[in-house]
């Protein structure tokens, strides 16, 4: 198997895992068209785009941990985490789907569903709530 074939298999494996864990909820909330388009976008990412996505996630994690430790959902670390989260979504979602409303809706879904909440809270307890508050604050500032 070539390096490219391994990379494609790796992406497909992650898409399948994500579909199994979150697919029903995503399809219920946003529909098959958006779910399928998001999966296709992920399949189409190049190695460098995938690496960039991973780098964003690592930086998001570091900033969110710092924000929780700082205890400030509107501080520099938290707001940078919210910005990184938006950038991550733009790399993962179909082109043109991102909006402040969609970002805020997804963030609040994280709090409502333990599967989503546990992803960020595994980094540090309270991370999901800080991220959601930071996203709300960032998007409110942007609307002003």
Predicted regions and their residues:
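Amphipathic alpha-helical "stalk" segments
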Residues: 1-144
């Amino acid at each position: 198997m070539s390096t490219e074939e391994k990379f494609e298999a790796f992406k497909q494996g992650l898409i399948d895992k994500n579909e199994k864990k979150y697919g029903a909820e995503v399809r219920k909330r946003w529909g098959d068209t958006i779910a399928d388009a998001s999966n296709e976008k992920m399949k189409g990412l190049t190695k460098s785009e995938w690496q960039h996505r991973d780098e964003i996630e690592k930086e998001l994690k570091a900033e969110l941990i710092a924000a929780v430790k700082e205890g400030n959902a509107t501080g520099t670390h938290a707001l940078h985490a919210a910005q990184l989260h938006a950038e991550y979504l733009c790399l993962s979602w179909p082109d043109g789907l991102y909006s402040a409303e969609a970002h805020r809706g997804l963030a609040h879904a994280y709090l409502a569903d333990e599967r989503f909440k546990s992803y960020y809270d595994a980094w540090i307890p309270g991370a999901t709530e800080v991220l959601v508050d930071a996203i709300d604050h960032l998007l409110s500032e942007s609307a002003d």
